[in-house]
Amino acid sequence: MARSRSISGYGIWKYLNPAYYLRRPRRLALLFIVFVSVSMLVWDRINLAREHEVEVFKLNEEVSRLEQMLEELNGGVGNKPLKTLKDAPEDPVDKQRRQKVKEAMIHAWSSYEKYAWGKDELQPRTKDGTDSFGGLGATMVDSLDTLYIMGLDEQFQKAREWVASSLDFDKDYDASMFETTIRVVGGLLSAYDLSGDKMFLEKAKDIADRLLPAWNTPTGIPYNIINLRNGNAHNPSWAAGGDSILADSGTEQLEFIALSQRTGDPKYQQKVEKVITELNKNFPADGLLPIYINPDNANPSYSTTTFGAMGDSFYEYLLKVWVQGNKTSAVKPYRDMWEKSMKGLLSLVKKSTPSSFTYICEKNGNNLIDKMDELACFAPGMLALGASGYGPDEEKKFLSLAGELAWTCYNFYQSTPTKLAGENYFFTAGQDMSVGTSWNILRPETVESLFYLWRLTGNKTYQEWGWNIFQAFEKNSRVESGYVGLKDVNTGAKDNKMQSFFLAETLKYLYLLFSPSSVISLDEWVFNTEAHPLKIVARNDPRKPTIALRQRKFGHQINV
């Protein structure tokens, strides 16, 4: 019995001894076959798990597509098209104004091309460039879709060649998640959706992959700064207690969802969806969140609540992800969160005296602060865009509020000697508004809202206001070598920077303000917060976006 156990033990161990196989070639071959088979089995299981994840993503896409079809058959209210202005015979004045805006873009681009080619931004007064975003070609990438929409083919192709041959993201640079996503990922995806050029999609995937480690936190709420080379992520040193910033953490959804749709890889969408899922767990009844969020436990910090800096685009993206998903049931949670936030916005609305300017306060704790950033002037456009999802009475109420806020924002411009708005305004009883921070850096938010309101109401007053703002830029900001901001809107003293968003947003929205509504139709495109249009595709719909071809004359979009 003992011997039997001994022999049995020897019989097991001899097969584990390499010498046993080395003396017998056939057995060595057998060992090799077993090794290869086991390796293939393990590798196959890894691949199978990955394929299963992708397959589940595609199945969810198909389910959502079928749900969308059912909603359309049932005539779902939430999926009704926007009441956008129908194209009519072109007003000659609109054509002339559109051409003037196009000429402004040519002047801005030619100056960048001459003095700062490949740099992030142009410094017009010193006629050189600066890499304010680590050398990511911010102006180049930000301008791609504007050039395309305006029909500036030669300039677009030259920029395309630079992106293909010279844009390199392998940099030891601590990048802002927010800025890199909205400018670079958004700009590249928009260029892809417009042109169909897959090079842009590959570049977008490259930079997005470098940003992904920022979401590796206990809650999935991302750190807001990441090194593009080594993936080390952290929050800005000046942020309260090392917290993440609300807008910086909730303004990647449009771009990363679009990237998953275009590539078929769910990982991008999964990262950004988890953020909203986490925030929705304890989303307040008024839908208002402070500007600082702890990435370890998702708790908001006691801090300012605002529709201005560091809060703004979080609320914008709740609405626009719903629009991007074609307003189907798959994206209804975003709409629900946004409607809660609009109840909160109403609680912040006040009127000045004596002129009854409607404005949006900031809030600190339970205290309202009578201050409104020019950045918050995106809100009229957001309200107009979202109004159609309500019933008739609520739609009318929110459109009316949008118009009142737009009038206030327009008067931010009209109330200064240069007719350009300051950075923020304070409201004092009996004195209406007074400029606080007095610089103007060529921001787009007011003309953005005028664009939406004109498209959705057909009221040409908004075009007139936009034209007046454009003329003020031409008078005060245009210089021989580009456009500059103002250090002070009261004195007209100039700075030395042409912000990339002036080409990406301000000039694009002004151009579209005087273009037919078929040019980047709001029923077919959704703009990210940097004004990069992304094709609307039903959430999880496996169908690729229809690429639009351009009429050469005006840059009109025609679906084929």
From Swiss-Prot:
Protein name, as recorded: Mannosyl-oligosaccharide 1,2-alpha-mannosidase MNS1
Effect of deleting the gene: No visible phenotype; due the redundancy with MNS2. Lack of complex N-glycans, shorter roots and increased lateral root formation in mns1 and mns2 double mutants.
Function: Class I alpha-mannosidase essential for early N-glycan processing. Progressively trims alpha-1,2-linked mannose residues. Produces Man(5)GlcNAc(2) from Man(8)GlcNAc(2), but only Man(6)GlcNAc(2) from Man(9)GlcNAc(2). Has difficulty acting on the terminal mannose of the b-branch. Involved in root development and cell wall biosynthesis.
Key words, A-Z: Calcium, Coiled coil, Disulfide bond, Glycoprotein, Golgi apparatus, Hydrolase, Magnesium, Manganese, Membrane, Metal-binding, Signal-anchor, Transmembrane, Transmembrane helix
Pfam families membership: Glyco_hydro_47
Record keyword Metal-binding present: yes
Organism: Arabidopsis thaliana
SS bond partners: C377-C409
Reactions catalysed according to its record: N(4)-(alpha-D-Man-(1->2)-alpha-D-Man-(1->2)-alpha-D-Man-(1->3)-[alpha-D-Man-(1->2)-alpha-D-Man-(1->3)-[alpha-D-Man-(1->2)-alpha-D-Man-(1->6)]-alpha-D-Man-(1->6)]-beta-D-Man-(1->4)-beta-D-GlcNAc-(1->4)-beta-D-GlcNAc)-L-asparaginyl-[protein] (N-glucan mannose isomer 9A1,2,3B1,2,3) + 4 H2O = N(4)-(alpha-D-Man-(1->3)-[alpha-D-Man-(1->3)-[alpha-D-Man-(1->6)]-alpha-D-Man-(1->6)]-beta-D-Man-(1->4)-beta-D-GlcNAc-(1->4)-beta-D-GlcNAc)-L-asparaginyl-[protein] (N-glucan mannose isomer 5A1,2) + 4 beta-D-mannose; N(4)-(alpha-D-Man-(1->2)-alpha-D-Man-(1->2)-alpha-D-Man-(1->3)-[alpha-D-Man-(1->3)-[alpha-D-Man-(1->2)-alpha-D-Man-(1->6)]-alpha-D-Man-(1->6)]-beta-D-Man-(1->4)-beta-D-GlcNAc-(1->4)-beta-D-GlcNAc)-L-asparaginyl-[protein] (N-glucan mannose isomer 8A1,2,3B1,3) + 3 H2O = N(4)-(alpha-D-Man-(1->3)-[alpha-D-Man-(1->3)-[alpha-D-Man-(1->6)]-alpha-D-Man-(1->6)]-beta-D-Man-(1->4)-beta-D-GlcNAc-(1->4)-beta-D-GlcNAc)-L-asparaginyl-[protein] (N-glucan mannose isomer 5A1,2) + 3 beta-D-mannose; N(4)-(alpha-D-Man-(1->2)-alpha-D-Man-(1->2)-alpha-D-Man-(1->3)-[alpha-D-Man-(1->2)-alpha-D-Man-(1->3)-[alpha-D-Man-(1->2)-alpha-D-Man-(1->6)]-alpha-D-Man-(1->6)]-beta-D-Man-(1->4)-beta-D-GlcNAc-(1->4)-beta-D-GlcNAc)-L-asparaginyl-[protein] (N-glucan mannose isomer 9A1,2,3B1,2,3) + H2O = N(4)-(alpha-D-Man-(1->2)-alpha-D-Man-(1->2)-alpha-D-Man-(1->3)-[alpha-D-Man-(1->3)-[alpha-D-Man-(1->2)-alpha-D-Man-(1->6)]-alpha-D-Man-(1->6)]-beta-D-Man-(1->4)-beta-D-GlcNAc-(1->4)-beta-D-GlcNAc)-L-asparaginyl-[protein] (N-glucan mannose isomer 8A1,2,3B1,3) + beta-D-mannose
Cofactor comment text: Ca(2+) or Mn(2+). Mg(2+) can be used to a lesser extent.
Name of encoding gene: MNS1
Protein topology in the membrane: Single-pass type II membrane protein
Superkingdom field: Eukaryota
BP GO annotations: carbohydrate metabolic process; N-glycan processing; protein glycosylation
Involved pathway(s): Protein modification; protein glycosylation
